[in-house]
Amino acid sequence: MRTALLFILLLLTACNQGPTLERLGGPTMGSSYSIQYVREPGGPEPAQVQRAVETILHDIDHHYSTYRGDSIVSQFNRLPAGQCLALPPDMLALVSLGQHLAEQSDGAFDLTVEPLLDLWGFGPQARHQQVPEPQALAQVRQRVGYQHLRVKGRALCKDAPVQLDFNSIVAGHAVDLIAARLQAMGISSFVAEATGELKAVGRKPDGSPWRIALELPREDRQIARQIIPVDSLSVSTSGDYRHYFEQNGRRYSHTFVARLGRPVEHDLAAVTVLDASALLADGYSTLLLILGPQQGWDFAVAHDLAAVLVTRAEGGFVSRATPAFERAVKGQ
């Protein structure tokens, strides 16, 4: 009788347990990832979720890391001109998006920027950060250009010794994959974040929306400039304020105008883009940052992108939000 009564009490206690907020995270892509999710009674445990997430991130690293000699992208980058390499479908899809963004930006955005990153001191083969000599820059620019890539069946081919760098879009791709996996596991409310790119779906256990802080573009500390409610949207911010060097009083960031072979030279400090796809948000935030304050604004408005552009001004920053961003924040 006591055993039966104890079983009934335990069962009633389990039935009364509501949803809980679980958190987990770890290192990835030279940075970190974090997951918050609402665990319903009987839902997947954090350890199970973490294994699923890290399986995805391991595959991402094997496909896209330029810091691994055995990655697929490193294998492609070592190929001489005139050669092809069979790629997994997801890599071909990202190449296709990169080519589309390159065409939209007249070559300002370009996945073949890797040799420039190395030359200026931001890539995996970099020796030191400095402005390169004109002759060295001219030689490297011959190895940059999206027009040197072509897809042949399931293979990617090159007609010049170009090298790929997916860092402008791969974190968003990872977030989309993680979000899809969480939903397949029956998790309907979560925030999935990798290297700062994130996607929020559903609501917290108390029914309130997920709220995301958009930072001021400062390298010394983190200060929120705006906090927005997010549901079923991805948030991507690209900026030039954390990875840069200075030489002779000038600032050189890791964001490049590929067709010019140089870092950006304008006052646009950061761009945030909202989109249902973390991949697209990631790509377009980078593209707008490359284009600069006015050309980026014109592009965002013309393509109905939900974007905020933060420009350096005397004494601080000026933020400018597109109509699509205002609608997205209001849930329209």
Regions found by a protein language model. Give the residues of each.
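Bacterial N-terminal signal peptides
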Residues: 4-13
